[in-house]
Amino acid sequence: MNNSILNKLKSLRNRYQEIEIMLTQKNVISNRENLKTLSKEYLKLSEIIKYFIEWEKLEVDIENVNILLNDVEIQGMAEEELYFFNKKKKALEKKINQLLLPEDPNDKHSCFIEIRSATGGDESSIFAGELFRMYLRYAESYSWKVEIMNTSESEKGGFKEIIAKITGRGACGRLKFESGGHRVQRVPETESQGRIHTSTCTVAVMPVTPKTEKEEINSSDLKIDTFRSSGAGGQHVNTTDSAIRITHIPTGNVVECQDERSQHKNKAKALSILSARVYAAKLEKDRQESSSMRKILLGTGERSDRNRTYNFPQNRITDHRINLSIYKLDEVLQGKLDLLIDPIIQEYQADMLSSLSKSES
């Protein structure tokens, strides 16, 4: 463990001991709000301090065993013990490092996921549909609920655009790395020469903000239009003006919802998506101050962000952000997305830990 992290832990232990004393004082106990705040901080610190105390004890044990290595009679036993202690120490340091990382308050929330076809025409729309089904299966593996908010279907199948709300604890934290450009390489069914075509889709992931954090949107900043909902190819599926188009005038953001028969429900859905977009834009502005690696990993949902290539002939999927290729494309499309998300999270946490070390040094 480097000195900067060690100093950080010692500082946290001092704070922990300080709060421990404060929680016995009458003036603190009598102030309900202050007591609640301090108790919450104490509880949060208690876990990391518990591991730190265990780590310090291990350091002493390792030091003692190293002395025993000089004794020929018990050298073999000492080496076994040293191996066990070092393995335990490594696991403890990993746990401590994870606990030291600052929490993203949005990670525990639900999210909206917006998939749009980009370049490649019908093939891009078909791929957008496949991406949605991949996320649907992934959500099912975590028992998250998926609600389709709005769709714009393509004549040849798939979607020009699909927006879904994924409800479940931790959905945003795991899916936030999906924002950006997704490229598919394969031979389309309509290709008679057997040539591989390249198409792209964009994905944007936005946290579903709780009521207390919802971005306030002035009604004067909104332009609301109603129109008749229609299916693929422009066929009318509703004879009333139940579809809603809301334009956020300051940003030019436009949201359409037409999947519900009720105009009121479509409006509620559109406003919730718009609120998430405005909030996500605010987060993106704040994120510009973060390290370049974190900006690359998180993406912005723009097509210029090249996240992955899905190569069907090779059954290969490549994540360009961390230079990772795996030959399990079929499994990933069936929802085994953690094969890619876990390595991304590890890279992200490593970058955050590196930044933490620099700030403490």
Curated annotation (Swiss-Prot):
Chief place where the protein resides: cytoplasm
Location in or out of the cell: Cytoplasm
Cellular component GO terms, alphabetical: cytoplasm
Keywords assigned: Cytoplasm, Methylation, Protein biosynthesis
Record-linked NCBIfam families: prfA, PRK00591.1
PANTHER family named among the record's database cross-references: LD18447P
Protein name stated in the entry: Peptide chain release factor 1
Protein source organism: Buchnera aphidicola subsp. Acyrthosiphon pisum (strain APS) (Acyrthosiphon pisum symbiotic bacterium)
Classification lineage: Bacteria, Pseudomonadati, Pseudomonadota, Gammaproteobacteria, Enterobacterales
Gene name per UniProt: prfA
